[in-house]
């Protein structure tokens, strides 16, 4: 790489300028590109190891590194530096990984690492899109053998018009968030969240995005061409194909294909379960292994690879040509479905969803508004009321593995199921709860993420959450053989492993709420998309029907074990009265009632308590603390002090040892007749009726017993009649003395 030359090129993307630069930073990486999009800046590097590894998979790692200095923040906590990647960072890394992985040579075993370091963030220009384009460019100018570059965009739709890479204000009004990545001739990856958008319109969005992707791919191709001429790009390294002895290959494939075909057809005819099929197929495969190792003892690795190649070829050919599946189902048939709700006694809502040998237990928990998740990363600061977490324990597949914290796959599956239900969650004004759903994959044979969507819907409805509409999901598969393809509905584990696509579609009866597509081939066409979406719609409607047979609408009441939330509003100026000095009053209120109390800046108050009576008590206390005495209103108040000039009456009692609201009944307002001594009319501790008649210049409350009696019809007759108008008082003058 040249030490002195720098290549900078730009393209218009979504009405803003995107710039690629190489030759200035990170020159020791195999490929490095600095991407600038608006004021978003991401450095993307691609590095390849010199030596191959003795493994049976391609070791690709994509790391998306968020730096808080990118938005002018210092990390919180004691350490004051970035720690583990956030959930957003993990999802962004997966977003880059998925479209590029199928474009590497099938037999590549050199480790490749792509690192996207987010250095500056402008909220209107998504750093994950800049990182995806940068990863493609960095790989393409390097010696790493990516078959062809990719491009990626976000497609939104505002007022019926598609928008490329919508800005924050546009995204707020968009009914879809569709990430499309692909090459110049095919779509490689789709990730979407939507507000019940019909399949046909989602497809148009995908195709619209792909047209812009083609422009980005051409831009990266031209960037590499210029970089080659400047010594800033390199020729691709060669990855040799594994070579087999032709005699050995022919002997193994001929016999193995026939034996495996008979075994697969037997499994299909008998409709064996996953475990039964695994036992049966293991016997067949082990028998073939032993037979060929006796014949070719010096090539154990090659023997295994050829037998696996035969299995993949046979299973795929049976699906595409015979239209048979290994479990005996039709191409568009869904496995048997079982639905249960209310499974666990003390939880707020549960749904047990079983589809074939995939089983998900989803549990919904309702909490107070204060329990919502605060998202404090590189994006716009916001909070999340609905959370979905997905767990995949090893026993779900009958395996033993260490139990660790959630990995990238679990985080990705959880986010997909969360996205599918998010548009259906009622707003805070309708249902003022924080909601968390945990989906436990307790049995797995494919499509646990879509099972989690179904389980989540059931658990939320069981918890009494008034969803806008129930949601279900189904995973579609694809077998592409030469010029023909077969789309499979509700794929299981083996079909996912041996197939070319995992296309997950979730939504309501009205439209799609989430999409995710992963493929293992260099892209798919519009025709494949159309058929997959059409089959997915039919499958989703079938699954929804099964779910609604068990629970057709959300329960009318939330669980008795869930906190009841009481809402009220106070004047914002009264918030300090509830909080008290140093939070003293609010703490005492929580301790006394056991309720969870949240006060918003605009004066909205949410009281959450499992014990409904304690919640009501907390409401009464808050109303008492914030109550204002209304002028002109009658009150029954307790006489707290008696003085020579009147008495003080508490018209709103104090609570929790706090003083109540009291005012002065002047001695002239105690009775209609003249009062010489206050004690002649009232005694301390006595409860009397008074009327609030106003405030003095110091803001002190003035009360009247006399006016209260008048309003109650207890005034003397003469005092109730209209009084004659008073004559003007003349100055007193003594008559002059006269002389006699």
UniProtKB/Swiss-Prot annotation:
PROSITE patterns: KH_TYPE_1 (PS50084), S1 (PS50126). GO terms for molecular function: 3'-5'-RNA exonuclease activity; magnesium ion binding; polyribonucleotide nucleotidyltransferase activity; RNA binding. Residues 707-740 are annotated as: Disordered. It is found in: Cytoplasm. It catalyses: RNA(n+1) + phosphate = RNA(n) + a ribonucleoside 5'-diphosphate. Disulfide bonds: none annotated. Residues 632-706 form the S1 motif domain. GO terms for biological process: mRNA catabolic process; RNA processing. Its EC number is 2.7.7.8. Mg(2+) binds at residues 496, 502. Residues 723-740 have a biased composition (Basic and acidic residues). Pfam families: KH_1 (PF00013), PNPase (PF03726), RNase_PH (PF01138), RNase_PH_C (PF03725), S1 (PF00575). Its cofactor is Mg(2+). Residues 563-622 form the KH domain. CDD domains: KH-I_PNPase, RNase_PH_PNPase_1, RNase_PH_PNPase_2, S1_PNPase. One of its GO terms (cellular component) is cytosol. InterPro entries: ExoRNase_PH_dom1, ExoRNase_PH_dom2, ExoRNase_PH_dom2_sf, KH_dom, KH_dom_type_1, KH_dom_type_1_sf, NA-bd_OB-fold, PNPase. HAMAP family: PNPase. NCBIfam families: polynuc_phos (TIGR03591), PRK11824.1 (NF008805). Belongs to the polyribonucleotide nucleotidyltransferase family. Involved in mRNA degradation. Catalyzes the phosphorolysis of single-stranded polyribonucleotides processively in the 3'- to 5'-direction. This is Polyribonucleotide nucleotidyltransferase. It comes from Desulforamulus reducens (strain ATCC BAA-1160 / DSM 100696 / MI-1) (Desulfotomaculum reducens).
